[in-house]
From Swiss-Prot:
Family: Belongs to the V-ATPase 116 kDa subunit family.
Organism of provenance: Arabidopsis thaliana (Mouse-ear cress)
Pfam family for this entry, one: V_ATPase_I
Name of the featured protein: V-type proton ATPase subunit a1
Gene Ontology biological process terms, A to Z: proton-transporting V-type ATPase complex assembly
Function comment: Essential component of the vacuolar proton pump (V-ATPase), a multimeric enzyme that catalyzes the translocation of protons across the membranes. Required for assembly and activity of the V-ATPase. Required during cell expansion.
Transmembrane segments: 423-443, 469-489, 548-568, 581-601, 640-660, 759-779
Subcellular localization, as worded in the UniProt entry: Vacuole membrane; Golgi apparatus, trans-Golgi network membrane
Topology, Cytoplasmic side: 1-422, 490-547, 602-639, 780-817
Parts forming coiled coils: 97-133
Alphabetical UniProt keywords: Coiled coil, Golgi apparatus, Hydrogen ion transport, Ion transport, Membrane, Transmembrane, Transmembrane helix, Transport, Vacuole
GO MF, one annotated term: proton-transporting ATPase activity, rotational mechanism
Known partners and oligomeric status: V-ATPase is a heteromultimeric enzyme composed of a peripheral catalytic V1 complex (components A to H) attached to an integral membrane V0 proton pore complex (components: a, c, c'', d and e).
Vacuolar-side positions: 444-468, 569-580, 661-758
Length: 817
């Protein structure tokens, strides 16, 4: 047996890549180029040799800080380009590599230029808004200034007392000074203040004015015809023009303070119509000049942003790469002579030649007199886990890694999940009509794979696109299982020939009550379509799917135990084989393997034996005669033997292994043997950074802890054998639920609506059926079957052999940043 196992080929996909711990001694002059080339290769994971230092104490902290500042500037440029609504496609021609210092100076110049243009534009926009508000106030407030007194005294009072706030339009002061007579003031006449305010503040503003003046004021307001842009948010704001009439200096002071508090802008409006027109013309002239200036400034700013945008993508990539390089250099140690850097890391064994060639090229390109020293170190800690995947296997590997990363060189469940996962999903989802819908969705994702891979997708769409090959396999297996169940949207078809059953008479009036009669050979593939609608349809399908679920569950659990044997053999743990794998196989198959055998024999012989009675009385009365429940000769003595083996297997799992470990430990420290214990035989829970195969396990041996752990493990397996077998009955339950839901929607919605002559009712029935099929059967049921298949793999299958306490291989790679 050992010779046969040794001759088996290496299972490369089953286990993670062999890893090697390497050390690099890099001269300072070639360090940057060497790390850059290694990042392009992406097959070396560096260890942090400066973990005890803060980020500010590391050698290249200043360079990392400079890269961070450049990243901030690039984000600023990107925000400005997006805010301006520009679409800058990157240059197609290859740009020459730019030095970090030159790029830093360019970014500083561009940022200074853009900030200065933004500042000027903001000032111009503020001035433009004030002029625009002044124009609106002049147009709207003139309607409120109707007075019977149009003499010079009234004008002088109005012009002298009209007030505007500090943030008013200053350039109009020269015209107003010409209009006003500072030498004359009427302290007892009626005055007014005109201005403009945001519409959402109007109600509170009016209420505050009323309370402050105790009602001694007249408030008039009208909505402006055009919205005004807010310079701070660049949003259009609706504003309202107001005119407040009052009397007295004290009221004037209060009103101005309230206007300032509410952000209302006050503007002087002359009462004379001629002066209003003169002032309006002056404001319109200045508005026209400012519009031309703003348009020219916007064009200049967009041209500057376009020149940055053409190279923005390349600059972002360059800065990210440089920052990643310096972050990696900070993980290396400076030699005491300050002439070289020392680094350590993990790489796949197959990549050593490639890494060596890359380091030689870096030495040549940097014109260094001393080459990089690259040599292999003796591994003490457990290496990282690295699986090479493709587009098909990557999604399944991610599903397994979501539960736990495999221990180094541990059997990889993802290899088997590529087939078992979509198949168990299909057992629960089996309907080849629904499977075709899933297949169309998967084919759409595959057809647009190249385009969708370059787009930024939403979280849901990204999840679907990442699992496109999983969906494809689930659809194909669903079509296969649907053909076995003979269900197309719950409707059976005579695809593989005619039925083996027929009615007792031509009317088929007693088909459901009395049943059909068999008149030819069985239906060649899958369930006979005549079972549909018969009186034994549900008992037949229940029995079929329940027994099939048990068979599939026992087969997958046995596969998990077999993988635990290969794990133990690979790591050289003979104790796990003798005292764990063998009794577990005996216990599981003595009970549930025997049940699977009975199911197959009953199917093959057509026996009417009650398997529930057989299994129950196998424990209660093992020596009792089976009578009509006997399926084969010698069944009763076989049951007694299997029952005894199951009882023997429990203490076999529990007692020998802890005592064997204790004996090995005592012999080791008494000097009778000096062999190094394999870690899996000493500690049942190996940490990811513990020694494996090359290091000495120095932890104190605690027999009571080992014994309690083995006791828990044994009890968990014994109870889990029952619960896990029962858990696989979810395959039967969800398959039945999916089938019955499909039947209800087909018969109670589609057929019921189709029975009416009204075309509207038929259309409503088709719409409801399509909605229920799409959202309940194709979305909710798909998600439900997906999660149940996930549970069966994580708990029932992987729980038999998978430790999942490893850590991922995360190489330094530019492709991952």
């Amino acid at each position: 047996m050992e010779e046969f196992l040794d001759k088996l080929p290496q299972m490369d996909l089953m286990r993670s890549e062999k890893m090697t711990l390497v050390q690099l001694i890099i001269p300072v002059e070639s360090a940057h180029r060497s790390i850059t080339y290694l990042g392009e290769l992406g097959l070396l994971q560096f260890r942090d040799l400066n973990a005890d230092k803060s980020p500010f104490q590391r050698t290249f902290a200043n360079q990392v800080k400079r890269c961070g500042e450049m990243s901030r500037k690039l984000r600023f440029f990107k925000d400005q380009i997006d805010k301006a609504g520009l679409r800058c496609s990157p240059r197609l021609e290859i740009e020459p590599d730019i030095a970090l210092g030159d790029l830093e100076r360019q970014l500083a110049d561009h940022e200074h230029e853009v900030l200065e243009m933004n500042s000027n534009s903001e000032k111009l926009r503020q001035t433009y808004n004030e002029l625009l508000e002044f124009k609106i106030v002049l147009e709207k407030a003139s309607g409120f200034l109707v007075s019977s007194n149009t003499h010079a005294i009234g004008e002088e009072i109005e012009l002298h007392e009209s007030t505007y706030s500090n943030n008013g339009f200053i350039e109009t002061a020269s015209l107003l000074e010409q209009e006003m007579n500072p030498g004359h003031s009427n302290q007892s006449g009626l005055r007014f203040i005109s201005g403009i305010i945001n519409k959402d503040k109007l109600l509170k503003f009016e209420r505050m004015l009323f309370r402050a003046t105790r009602g001694n004021m007249l408030f008039n307001q009208t909505t402006s015809d055009e919205e005004i842009m807010d310079p701070s948010t660049s949003e259009m704001v609706e504003k309202v023009v107001f005119v407040v009439f009052f009397s007295g200096e004290q009221a004037r002071t209060k009103i101005l303070k309230i206007c300032e508090a509410f952000g209302a802008n006050c503007y002087p409006v002359p009462e004379d119509t001629t002066k209003q027109r003169q002032l309006t013309r002056e404001v319109l002239s200045r508005l026209s000049d400012l519009e031309a200036t703003l348009d020219a400034g916007t064009r200049h700013r967009n041209n500057a942003l376009n020149s940055v945008g053409y190279s923005l993508t390349n600059w972002i990539t360059t800065v990210r790469r440089e920052k990643a390089v310096y972050d990696t250099l900070n993980m290396l140690n400076f030699d005491v002579t300050k002439k070289c850097l020392v680094g350590e890391g993990w790489c796949p064994t197959f990549a050593k030649t490639q890494i060596h060639e890359v380091l030689q090229r870096a030495t040549f390109d940097s014109s260094s007199q001393v080459g990089v020293i690259f040599h292999v170190m003796q591994a003490v800690e457990s290496p990282p886990t690295y699986f090479r995947t493709n587009k098909l296997t990557n999604a399944f590997q991610e599903i397994i890694d979501a539960y736990g990363v495999a221990r180094y060189q541990e059997a990889n469940p993802a290899v088997y999940s590529v087939v078992t996962y979509p198949f168990l999903f299909a057992v629960m989802f089996g309907d080849w009509g629904h499977g075709l819908c899933l297949l169309l969705g998967a084919l759409y994702l595959l057809a647009r794979e190249r385009k969708l891979s370059t787009q930024k997708l939403g979280s849901f769409m990204e999840m679907l696109f990442g699992g496109r090959y999983v969906i494809l396999l689930m659809a194909l297996f669903s079509i296969y299982c649907g053909l076995i169940y003979n269900e197309f949207f719950s409707v059976p078809f005579h695809i593989f020939g005619g039925s083996a059953y027929k009615c007792r008479d031509t009317t088929c009036s007693d088909a459901y009550t009395v049943g059909l009669i068999k008149y030819r050979d069985p239906y060649p593939f899958g369930v006979d379509p005549s079972w549909r609608g018969s009186r034994t349809e549900l008992p037949y399908l229940n029995s079929l799917k329940m027994k099939m679920s048990i068979l599939l569950g026992i087969a997958q659990m046995n596969l998990g135990l077999i993988l635990s044997f290969f794990n133990a053999r690979f790591f050289g743990s003979s104790l796990d084989i003798r005292y764990q794998f063998i009794p577990q196989m005996i216990f599981l198959n003595s009970l549930f393997g025997y049940l699977s055998l009975l199911i197959i024999i009953k199917w093959c012989t057509g026996s009417q034996a009650d398997l529930y009675h057989v299994m129950i009385y196998m424990f209660l009365s093992p020596t009792e005669e089976l009578g009509e429940n006997e399926l084969f000769w010698g069944q009763r003595p076989l049951q007694i033997v299997l029952l005894l083996l199951a009882f023997i297997a429990v203490p076999w799992m529990l007692f020998p292994k802890p005592f064997a470990l204790r004996k090995i430990h005592m012999e080791r420290f008494q000097g009778r043997t000096y062999g190094v214990l394999v870690s899996s035989e000493v500690d049942l829970d190996v940490e990811p950074d513990s020694a494996r195969g090359g290091g000495h396990h120095e932890e104190e041996f605690n027999f009571s802890e080992i014994f309690v752990h083995q006791l828990i493990h044994s009890i968990e397996f014994v109870l889990g054998s029952v619960s896990n077998t029962a858990s696989y009955l979810r395959l039967w339950a969800l398959s039945l639920a999916h089938s019955e839901l499909s039947t209800v929607f087909y018969e109670k919605v589609l057929l019921l609506a189709w029975g009416y002559e009204n075309i509207l009712i038929r259309l409503i029935g088709v719409a409801v059926f399509a909605f229920a099929t799409a959202f309940i059967l194709l979305m909710m049921e798909t998600l439900s079957a997906f999660l149940h298949a996930l549970r069966l793999h994580w708990v029932e299958f992987m729980g038999k052999f998978f430790n999942g306490d490893g850590y991922k291989f995360k190489p330094f790679s530019f492709a991952l940043i």
